[in-house]
């Protein structure tokens, strides 16, 4: 038997606050992890770790991106015991989506409709909890109580078979406390770096045209 982890958070970003305003749920984001240290998380989310878009299947890290800058947000960590075969299938499916991330998009409309309990499925489009749900269901790791397009992060707090191993502030999550952080990384430095990256990208595209 092996363990798959599901991390639930409410990051306090614009999109998170919008979902929270509509649903009132404790958690608005879901991620998967395949190791006890949570060294790498997987979800359908912001691809650069900071800005809302571009978004799609992406890796997340507890000491980078939004998780680095918003450490006081509420979170809950759940453990799911699965067979070795289901674990391997879930990990293989996840890594495949990461490797072909350019083929996938973030399911913005689906996320909004999920909050209203309306099913909306579009090929290769996923929001966070839909991504987590499909990986777990299609790998045979667990059965869902409803369609993946209707699974909200908060639904995982009510599922049988999941064990809550931590609940509290993200800053107090044991795995995060063991990680190293870049002391120079601040909100200002992050967004300045992103702005410079966009500027360089724009300059390169202009050069390609001419």
Per-segment meaning from a language model:
Residues 1-210:
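Cysteine-nucleophile amide-bond enzymes
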